[in-house]
């Protein structure tokens, strides 16, 4: 007798991070706006105000908010969407057996308990942030992200200080709602926010804003479950993921995705061709426009915020990949290339792209135009196939913009460091400054198990050059499906890369957290060092491995140098002695006997 598959209610991690509390900043233009941030407190002896930082963790880190996975999150944006009077509720399509991979009975993931009627744009209305921006309308979402980007900065010199090279970007000292509107209207930024994802806390992706990161997750035909995926979602955003892509394959795709979206405060992206392929039993040649169209509508009704569409893979480009070391490494790209070769025609994604735009326009699903021909090895970087597809993505961008659809462009991949900037420059030129979203890129191919590092190097560089969002890579890349620990490692690695890029491109205020932690380090405030870091738990555990006692939390040394060789302790002694004797006296003392190099007398011959 077969044992029934059990589907327990997922347990997710909640509660604030150390020394942190959730704060909310009210809007001024629109009622009801409360922008979440995390405030990190320092020790009272520091004499410093709490530090506000960007927070994508949603209500899960707010002890004053009760969350129940079975009910989902509160519909934050529902009133904003309704007030615009350009959408309508309708019955929606019926869920079919194919939507969940034909799984039945006790192996079927239960439906999410709450199922609201889906919304769509009325008649010819375009309920997209791009359409509103072009009409001169500043939406609540635009004000929300402006407040969020500023992180309680003001226009004072200390808050607007910047030191970097932005390579021609237009980064303002202070982000206003009007600046957000103008960037979206120009196509340089997007707010991925499906009208059927009201639980979303709006965020912005663009070159002139904070660099964002995405975390991938998803079930496969081999491993993982709905419970694990919901837990990984909450875990990823706890550590700073700005968006999450559900790349599920195998069975139970529809129901698992519903649980994820209803419990996600961040945008959710998908690759619809994966589910469409499951509906035709994994046979790429059997894919049709009708199956794909139905899948788009299914996912749009659920609330997916952005679609990766590999419409740039064209028939004449496929032969360009034959001599590559690693061929076509994109799953979506390889699926469409196989379809094109079998049918010897352009893909239905390319031929029906305007119809795809019409669907996305109805729900404000943003495009993430996929790089199906991205290089899978540094030997293949910047080749003819990659850049031919990029040019096509630029053409498709204009078509989507004409339909009032928001667009970002996906990029590589595997690229050696000296070739990275060319990728950014070509993307800006070919794709008309639409936001760039890259996987890494990985800068070397010799480190399986450490590709979060090989890619973090490239991610920091391309983020500095202008990339708007970085897709994380975990230690399991090329090796297996990431688990909870891998997700955290990938997210933290990419938060480091994104922040390093923000510093390098001169984002105002980016250095505030660095300076706060540096002061804590110099003053031996160990607890503050832990709490101000991206990963307080790991920082403290490393410290406590060798100095675990509470007394060590105030010690003026660590186990690396010990008490006699700590450079910062010696610096404190030098500073104290200088203050005691006076800087002028100290200077005189050094002049008398402290010179390391004695100047030579002038031995040049006198002029005759």
From Swiss-Prot:
GO biological process, one term: thiamine biosynthetic process
Record's catalysed reaction(s): 5-amino-1-(5-phospho-beta-D-ribosyl)imidazole + S-adenosyl-L-methionine = 4-amino-2-methyl-5-(phosphooxymethyl)pyrimidine + CO + 5'-deoxyadenosine + formate + L-methionine + 3 H(+)
Binding note for cofactor: Binds 1 [4Fe-4S] cluster per subunit. The cluster is coordinated with 3 cysteines and an exchangeable S-adenosyl-L-methionine.
Pathway field: Cofactor biosynthesis; thiamine diphosphate biosynthesis
Cofactor(s) in the UniProt record: [4Fe-4S] cluster
Coiled coil (UniProt feature): none
Record: residues binding Zn(2+): 414, 478
MF (Gene Ontology): 4 iron, 4 sulfur cluster binding; carbon-carbon lyase activity; zinc ion binding
Gene Ontology CC: one annotated term: cytosol
Keyword list, A-Z: 4Fe-4S, Iron, Iron-sulfur, Lyase, Metal-binding, S-adenosyl-L-methionine, Thiamine biosynthesis, Zinc
Record-listed [4Fe-4S] cluster binding positions: 558, 561, 566
EC numbers for this chain: 4.1.99.17
Binding site for substrate: 216, 245, 274, 310, 330-332, 371-374, 410, 437
Keyword NADP tagged: no
InterPro entries: ThiC, ThiC-associated_dom, ThiC/Bza_core_dom, ThiC/BzaA/B
One family name in Pfam for this protein: ThiC-associated
Listed Gene3D superfamilies: 6.10.250.620, Radical SAM ThiC family, central domain
Keyword Metal-binding: yes
Membrane-traversing stretches: none
Subunit structure: Homodimer.
Free-text function comment from the UniProt entry: Catalyzes the synthesis of the hydroxymethylpyrimidine phosphate (HMP-P) moiety of thiamine from aminoimidazole ribotide (AIR) in a radical S-adenosyl-L-methionine (SAM)-dependent reaction.
NCBIfam families (alphabetical): PRK09284.1, PRK13352.1, thiC
PANTHER family reported for this sequence: PHOSPHOMETHYLPYRIMIDINE SYNTHASE, CHLOROPLASTIC, THIAMINE BIOSYNTHESIS PROTEIN THIC
Family: Belongs to the ThiC family.
Name of the protein: Phosphomethylpyrimidine synthase
Recorded name of the encoding gene: thiC
